[in-house]
Every structure is written in C-alpha cells, then in structure tokens.
Amino acid sequence: MNCTNCCSDSTFESIVAYNASGVKHNVVLNDTLSEHSIMAQITKHADQLYLPRPPRWALLHNAFSMSGNAEKPYFDIGVAIPKAVVADLYDEMLPLMSSTLHTLSESLPDFVTFNSSIVDQMQWERVADVELSDGTSEAECNLFALVNEFCCNAILPPIIGAQFTESYQLLATDLAALNSRYWAVALGLPRLSPIPGLPGAALSQKRLIHNFTRMFGELTNPAVRRVPDDDESVSGDETDADVVTPVTKLNKLFTEHDLPLAARASVTLQLVHDIVAEVVPLVFWTLLHVYASSDGSAAKAFEVIPTGKIIAETKPWAPAFQPPSIHPSFPSPPAITFDPTFSELPADLMPYLHSCINESRRLYSCSALTYQLMAPITIYDPNSTVKQDTWILDADSYIDIGLSQSLINSSPAIFPEPKVYRPDRFTTIPYPPSTSPSHPYKSALTLAILTGIFQLWEVAPAPKKSFFDHMNEAREEAQIGAAALSNEQKAAKNVQLKEKREKEGKVGKWVIPKAIDGASVKLPKADVRVRIRRREGLPAGGFGMRRVG
C-alpha cells in the first residue's frame, strides 16, 4: 500500500500497471466521482471480468478448508455455483429481507434486556460481558461482540435455516474469529505461527466446516419424520430440510453434480462469511462514529445532530413506539415496525443514513478483490487535465479492484480530509459503484439493522476503569465470596457505583479503536465498552397489537 501511495503522489496518470510473477496488474490511482468515472466504466464491463482460478482455489483451500480432492469436482461445475448463488440468494433478496425485518421487529426491543442473570439474557448479551450500570435502565457491554451476535441472529436463519443457527451456538463467534485472522488463514500460514489469535481462528474454521458438513448430511439424507399415530394430518418433526432456503436450493445443485459434503460446506461457509464479514463491521463502525459525532461539541461541526437526523429520516418507514402496558408494574418494552417496502426504498429517501454507511465503507474498506479480463476493454479518463485520454486494458491482464478503491478512498484530491469520518460526506456526492451482485442485499441488511438500533436505543461511551477500579471490584467480589447477590442488591450496588463515578467526575469519552484488516471491511483491534439505554419519549402506539415472542 505504501508503494502504491507513493506512485499516486508522484504520477499524473490515473491508471498504472505493475508486473507480479509475470502477470500484468492494472491499478486505478486517481478518479472522479462522476457517473463517467473510471470505476463506473469498469463496472459497465462486468461481463468481461472474472475471478481467475488460482486465487479462487487458494482462498477456498486455505480460508475455507476445501480438500484438494474436491478441486476437480468443484471446477467441473464451472460457473453454475456463482450463477445459482445470484439467482437463489441475491435475486431473491426481497423475501429474505422480509423474513429478516420480521426477526428484527421481534429482537430489536431485546437488544439489551437489562437482566443481570446470564440465564435470562439473550444470546447476544451473553457474549458481550453485560453489566448493569444504572439499575435496570442502563447496561454496559462490549459493542462489537453484541453487534456481531445480534446481526448473525437476524441475517443467517433465512439463508441457512433456523434449526441450524439455533443448534450451533458458536456460529457467530466462530465467524468473527475466522474473520479476525482471515488473511493469515487465507495465506495458508501454519496455525502455530507467532500471530496472536491464529490458533483460535484455525480452531473456529475446523468447527465451522464440521458443522456445515453435518448440516449438508442432514439436508441430503433427512431423518425420517415422526408422524403421530392419532393424527395423520400432522407432519411431525420439522427440520431445515423441510424449509426452502437458498442453501437447500444450492444443495440440490450440489447433489446433481455429486459434490462431496465437505466441499459443499466450504462453498457455503465462503458465502455466509462474505455477507457477515461486511455487514457486521459496517454496522459497528457506523454506530460508533454516528454516536460519537452526535456527542457534545462534535455535533456542532456537522450543524445537525447525526442521530437526530437519522431518527427523523427513517421514522416514516420504521417507526418506534411505546405499546400500552398490561399492568402499571410491568411496562411493555418499546416496539418497532418496518414498512413492507423498506428493502425497496431508494437511497434518496434516507440520504443521511446511506451517507453514514458509505462513509464507513470508504474509511474501512480493505477488499483485495482482483479480476482478470476476458477481452480487451477501452477506458477513457473523465479528467481532461491529464495527458493520456484513453487506455486499452489487455485481455488476460488483471484489475486490482479492491486496491484501486482503497487508494481512491484515501485520496485527499477526491475526498478532503480523507482520514476524518464525515457523516454527511455522501449526501451530495455519489459513492463509487460496486461490481458485486451481493452489494444491494448487504446494503439492505446494514440499513435495516442500523435503522432499528437508532430508533430504539441510545449508546454512550463507558467511563474507562483504572487499575484501582478493577482492584476494588476484585476485592469486593472476594469479600462477597460465594454469596450470590439478588437482582435488587446488584441494582442498588450499580446505582452506588454510578453516583460515585459522577461525584469523582468520571465521564466516558469516545475512543475510536485502531482498525485491523478483515476479509473486506476492517475490524476493531479491541472492543469498545459502551453504555446502552432505551430511547426515551417514544410516541404511544400499538394499541390492539400483541407482541409475539
């Protein structure tokens, strides 16, 4: 990256080429944001681009553990698998999004349940180290762990089946572990290499492949269903094989070509990982930056409070409300409903939130996507100040799409103050087009999850604990010993701690963690402790409605 940055600073050309292992690679160094930009022209030639076999196989073999024996059967199927993925998943995003929106409507009110007992917490809370910080109205937790588990719970069941996601409790955790050391695994480095986290990522990879292989065994040879003797109209036990999902459709293709079960697991893991590895970090970074930009003096720089702007612009299509309580002593949790057309809404109806997401993409994208040209293509430079007006990119040469986009995103000539997160940056300028057919689906998922969280929840930074704070907590726990505190005692203790911190002037400050490379979007090097509470002042609504679940 440093070498290409130097080239970008020292040349007037918009496209340069370099030779790697005897292969010519083209890189876009400079571009515009117009509809005739170089990247837009390349996107229009998408039918001339393909992923070459060697890097495709290297990723499948190393990152997704496909056996060498499966190479020939996999490539014998040819383009049928990518076409089936597009047809069965990305072209069918509306019914999939409908299921996801229903899940979000049910789970978003329980994003944080304010239960101190791990038994009563939701699955995503159990991995986020939740602590009550103000009675039962505020909780402190690890944001990335919470977001990762919550997003996987909403995204994956419509794709691979609810039974599998419920039975595989470590699915989200293993996907995150693999993504955190993705490039080390993809390069085939030994698991005992001196890289922190690599042994854990390798173990997660094995566990993922084992469970996906088991799933395909059950899909291909489903167990005989139990039919009750007294009622022949009842079908008995239902499995994922009975529910039509993109994975069950793919399994029919795999079965037709007799692809080994382990190879099916590798292909599906790559598909699932590709979605989660982009959506989860985008949700995390957007939440973090938007809430940080809405805090105190930071909001003055943007003239509007970003969270307020997002809440106002998304409210017509995803209103949050306070349902009536069944009993005064047991208030109902807030609720949210998504408009059925939410996934089809054009970007100009929610420009500010789209801008925030695209700014996260710009700042944290780290894709290494590279295409090979099937035929020569001609590109002209929309910038009239340069010498050369056109380039002919040769057939069989490569275009480094991911590297080019990273260089464009970090160029001060295109984006003023490129290292600064500006929520409104893309409200007036377009974001560079994507060549991926998965882009609309991933964007819709990211948009829906963020909309729900902004509508229902307030997030603030947690005060940083000193060494002495940790020592005091350890001493208090030792004094308590085996005696368990009741919920009331824990709530009272948390209130006392909050009052003590306020008295000492300890206030949380937003700290953006260092970013490290993931598969396609960068990840936080360390998690961020935040405090979450329900958004107050929600309008009354939902009369006559009953919350299911």
Language-model region placement:
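Conserved cytochrome P450 K-helix E-x-x-R motif and the immediately C-terminal K′/meander segment
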Residues: 312, 316-389, 408
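Charged, glycine/proline-rich intrinsically disordered loops and linkers
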Residues: 112-134, 227-245, 317-340, 471-502
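Cytochrome P450 heme-binding "Cys pocket" and the immediately downstream C-terminal segment
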Residues: 436-516
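C-terminal helix/juxtamembrane-tail motif
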Residues: 523-549
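Cytochrome P450 catalytic-core helices
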Residues: 278-313, 437-458
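Cytochrome P450 heme-thiolate monooxygenase catalytic core
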Residues: 100-282, 298-314
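Conserved cytochrome P450 K-helix/beta-meander segment immediately N-terminal to the heme-binding cysteine loop
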Residues: 395, 401-433
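N-terminal membrane-proximal hinge/A-helix region immediately C-terminal to the signal-anchor transmembrane segment
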Residues: 1-80, 92
